[in-house]
A protein has these predicted regions:
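Conserved short alpha-helical segments that host acidic/polar catalytic motifs at enzyme active sites
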Residues: 1-188
């Protein structure tokens, strides 16, 4: 069980993400992380092992990370030990796709083996990194939109999950998908 939060708007995203994660901390306290797109369109990722307090300290309560679009995650480890490396968000090899995930990807080992054969490297022992790189694979292979790439990946992923992703080439957008797992989206 994990907690996912996202924000797109006019305010600085990091403090809002951290506030949202604090409300979801009961869903996971092994590690936490955020990804925020800065004004130069680069996506900055900050992660911390342990409770959310560590991430809050690392980001100066969000005031050291600038941008108005981001995703955050608080983790309860299912695949891979609690560590900063296994903390979400995870990225594609080139950093174009960034994602967080809640749930279980049952066939992640099989998908990972196929991605390794296609030149992908893995740094964590999580199923989430596999999902992010699978989406990246379809995004690059077929030159589809993020929605098409996510749809191609979802057809191949077995399990119950919810995903939130950002693409460096699509600023101020967050893409979400779910299968048999809850996802609530609010608009204010």
């Amino acid at each position: 069980m994990c907690g996912i939060v996202g924000y797109v708007g006019k305010e600085q995203a990091a403090p809002i993400l951290l506030d949202g994660l604090s409300k979801l901390e009961y869903r996971g306290y092994d590690s936490a992380g955020i990804a925020v797109r800065d004004n130069a369109s680069a996506i900055k990722i900050v992660k911390a092992k342990g409770r959310l307090k560590g991430l809050i300290e690392k980001t100066d309560a969000g005031h050291a990370v600038f941008g108005t679009c981001g995703i955050g995650h608080t983790r309860w480890a299912t695949h891979g030990e609690p560590s900063e490396t296994n903390a979400h968000p995870h990225t594609s090899d080139d950093g174009n796709v960034v994602g967080v995930h809640n749930g279980i990807i049952e066939n992640y080992q099989e998908l990972k083996a196929k991605l390794v054969k296609n030149g992908y490297s893995f740094y964590s022992s999580t199923d989430t990194e596999v999902a992010v790189k699978l989406v990246d694979y379809y995004y690059k292979k077929y030159e589809h939109t993020p929605v098409d790439a996510i749809n191609h990946a979802m057809v191949r992923i077995r399990g119950s999950y919810a995903l939130a992703m950002m693409f460096e080439e699509y600023p101020n957008e967050i893409y979400v998908a779910r299968k048999d797992s809850p996802m609530i989206i609010g608009i204010a």
